[in-house]
């Protein structure tokens, strides 16, 4: 009996350790190993998640890895957000795996709500550094980008898409509560996401707006207040249906 009990304790301990041990990126920006890379492709290669880890990592943990991807910020190195996201999608096996998960939308919406829930306490906290606030803004924007990307939208029902638009509008309104922090790039991902979902739901909606710049929102080019205003009107009308 004692031997059986000991065996159960050991098995439980090993299982718990395996559950707690999570994969992390072995080489990070700023380290000597990272600085030693000669090419961008070497950095991309170093950030790939091993196949066995990809298949065994939970969707929630995989989302964490996608948000922690060392080259994620490079999305903004492109003139158009859509090009930046497509490069990220092409270069990183983690986001490609994430988009195949049947519970990807659920994980994204849950995480988005969590992030929005801590916005006020985080951004209004004098102890929180500007770097930490910047990380928060970028993290929220990345989640919005994921929610609206065509790779995710292709397999969603119209009802789910409308629910996501509703979530994004909640985030849009929350961001307006902290304009000093989100002004500029802080709104681009939200607009990009909603534009792509609206276009997937009904491509004629953007065309009916009769604004020559509104389709530019599909690429993440948010430089025309009139087109954003039209998109806002369309978005709010969708969630009232």
Residue ranges and their predicted role:
Residues 4, 21-22:
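Short hydrophobic "helix-edge" motifs at membrane interfaces and signal-peptide entry regions
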Residues 4-13:
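Sec-dependent N-terminal signal peptides
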Residues 14-18:
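Sec/Tat signal peptide C-region and signal peptidase I cleavage site
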Residues 19, 25-241:
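Non-catalytic all-alpha helical scaffold/repeat segments
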């Amino acid at each position: 009996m004692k031997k059986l009990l000991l065996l159960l304790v050991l098995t439980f301990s090993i299982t718990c350790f395996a559950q707690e041990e999570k994969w992390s990126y072995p080489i990070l920006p700023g380290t000597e190993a990272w600085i030693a890379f000669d090419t961008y492709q070497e950095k991309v290669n170093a950030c790939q998640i091993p196949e066995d880890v990809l298949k065994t990592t939970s969707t929630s943990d995989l989302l964490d890895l996608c948000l922690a991807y060392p080259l994620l910020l490079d999305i903004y190195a492109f003139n158009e957000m859509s090009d930046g996201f497509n490069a990220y999608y092409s270069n990183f096996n983690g986001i490609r795996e994430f988009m195949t998960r049947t519970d990807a939308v659920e994980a994204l919406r849950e995480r988005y709500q969590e992030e929005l829930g801590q916005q006020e306490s985080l951004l209004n906290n004098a102890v929180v550094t500007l770097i930490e606030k910047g990380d928060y803004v970028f993290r929220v924007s990345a989640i919005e980008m994921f929610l609206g990307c065509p790779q995710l939208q292709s397999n969603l029902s119209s009802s789910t898409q409308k629910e996501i638009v509703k979530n994004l509008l909640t985030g849009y309104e929350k961001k307006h509560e902290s304009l000093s922090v989100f002004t500029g790039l802080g709104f681009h991902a939200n607009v990009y996401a909603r534009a792509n979902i609206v276009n997937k739901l009904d491509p004629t909606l953007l065309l009916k707006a009769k604004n020559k710049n509104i389709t530019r929102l599909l690429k993440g080019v948010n430089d025309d207040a009139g087109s954003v205003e039209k998109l806002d009107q369309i978005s709010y009308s969708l969630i009232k249906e």
